[in-house]
Regions:
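PRPP-associated nucleotide enzymes
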Residues: 1-158
Length: 158
């Protein structure tokens, strides 16, 4: 009954910590099966931090860094994290991680930023992507989501 309501968009989904761990395992498996081996796993602040850390741990300790993408009126402003410098970006491959692609524009802005600095390959991953997302992730567990999803780390936000 609840899944039918979720599929119709009538109920918000609140995955538990255990479910989120299962998502991380499934997404890490999907990425590994594709053959993509990033040099860095990047969590896009804030929703991507926890999924990126979990995936990073599951993918044999790939270096984890964060990137801050702020929404601006005319696009995305990307801030660099002090632990990743421009010199270490050139020629490297990156996995950008979000919890959910609403529009996908945040990840698109971060990807463009890394590519402009010479990144060799940049792929995106998320647990869920909304049905109206303008940009589709390279790796996703559930695409075309029509309902709200509140992850455990969002429950503490005001």
């Amino acid at each position: 009954m609840v899944m039918q309501e979720i599929e119709r968009g009538n109920v918000a989904e609140n995955p538990s910590d255990d479910e989120v761990r299962e998502y991380a395992h499934a997404l890490a498996d999907q990425i590994e099966q594709s053959g993509f081996e990033p040099d860095y796993v990047i969590g896009i602040s804030r929703g991507g931090w926890r999924p990126a850390i979990d995936i990073c741990l599951l993918m044999k300790w790939k270096p984890f860094v964060t990137i801050d993408v702020k929404k601006a009126e005319y696009g995305r402003i990307v801030g660099e994290n002090p632990h990743i410098n421009r010199a270490s970006i050139k020629g490297q491959s990156f996995l950008l991680v979000e919890d959910m692609f609403e529009t996908g524009l945040t990840a698109k802005g971060a990807k463009r930023f890394l590519e402009s600095l010479g990144a060799k390959d940049v792929k995106t991953a998320c647990y869920f992507a909304r049905d109206f997302a303008e940009v589709k992730p390279d790796f996703v567990l559930r695409d075309g989501v029509t309902h709200e999803v509140f992850f455990p780390w969002e429950r503490f936000r005001k």
